[in-house]
């Protein structure tokens, strides 16, 4: 998994950060660790060694710029070279809100294309545009049903042929007519292989029919550096591929290899799939991506994610907190907001110092604890939620029985509530909680067993 890559790279860089003296021998040792981490993530050996030479040359020959120590300069060199490995610049999906856009999704069967179609629709929806979906894959029996379920979940119109008696070209033609009121049409085409000439000819016909603004190739991140061959084959067959969407990065040990391989052939990666949910699609930003992997965090993305899921009740809760009111009702609302943000590992990776070295078990424990805390609060009366100080021995035992937990776990929740309340109290007084202080205490209590 990519968190394993992040952990290995962070451990390598920590040798620099924790060293009393940085010499050529230490630089070479750290570079060997970086090489091992990247090769284990299936990054091409030649790319790794070329990058290593550049890191070594700059680390030994370059003087640190003003304001940076030697250690900081070497860490920055590694960061810059890793970013370069993944393509450096952000490739944005450009859509003109004043006219209808068409996106054609292509890729090999099993790459996650149908799920990606729904994720892309959700992404566009969050940008304030109205997406529509066309299910043009008549070859895979479950394709229409899968896209139907996903489209209903995100409230996006779908056109397709459940009977699978029409051709993909006819379905697309009818769908273009039916979806006149949407801003962006996303077409999920049949999965294919480069040797299937008939399917490639059909795709060309669909391309001519729809005149798409963008053709997005969906590639399975678990392929590792083999993704290069697949991307190149499609690029040669369909010369107008606009961009790449790499899926399944959350569960692949070869994700780094897939990303670097695609970047190597200058095929712009615009999106990455980071989980199974419809909201788990991100615009690919090499700098933010490497920053999160190395444990430097990505506060911009964290804020964006928070804004995306903030509803009226969450905003009311924050208003109450800022006015000095923080009961278990406000805590419950905050836990609900965190739950909607996605996998805990992903959220914590956006917080500086939390991502690169955090064990997977700790993230899982955090997620489990959040769920259990909510179950415990569901067993409380409204009076108890508004006045947690009322929860003494008899009430505590009743709540524990109702939630199916031990009384000690209710005490753990109340301790967490107290810590969080104090932190918010300081925030209200203009003091920013530090990761090593109260904020660290909050995160540690969630992440580790007592």
Swiss-Prot record:
Instruction: Share what the entry says about its subunit structure, partners included.
Output: Part of the signal recognition particle protein translocation system, which is composed of SRP and FtsY. Archaeal SRP consists of a 7S RNA molecule of 300 nucleotides and two protein subunits: SRP54 and SRP19.
**Species of provenance:** Methanococcus maripaludis (strain C6 / ATCC BAA-1332)
Q: What enzyme category does the UniProt record give?
A: hydrolase
Residues annotated for GTP binding in this entry: 107-114, 188-192, 247-250
Q: What does this protein do?
A: Involved in targeting and insertion of nascent membrane proteins into the cytoplasmic membrane. Binds to the hydrophobic signal sequence of the ribosome-nascent chain (RNC) as it emerges from the ribosomes. The SRP-RNC complex is then targeted to the cytoplasmic membrane where it interacts with the SRP receptor FtsY.
Gene3D superfamilies, alphabetized: P-loop containing nucleotide triphosphate hydrolases (3.40.50.300), Signal recognition particle SRP54, nucleotide-binding domain (1.20.120.140), Signal recognition particle, SRP54 subunit, M-domain (1.10.260.30)
Record carries keyword Transport: no
- Give a Gene Ontology cellular component term annotated to this protein: signal recognition particle
What's one Pfam family here?
Answer: SRP_SPB
Domain comment, in the record's words?
Composed of three domains: the N-terminal N domain, which is responsible for interactions with the ribosome, the central G domain, which binds GTP, and the C-terminal M domain, which binds the RNA and the signal sequence of the RNC.
Keyword annotations for this protein, in alphabetical order, are: Cytoplasm, GTP-binding, Hydrolase, Nucleotide-binding, Ribonucleoprotein, RNA-binding, Signal recognition particle
What's the Enzyme Commission number for this chain? Answer: 3.6.5.4
* The name this protein goes by in its record: Signal recognition particle 54 kDa protein
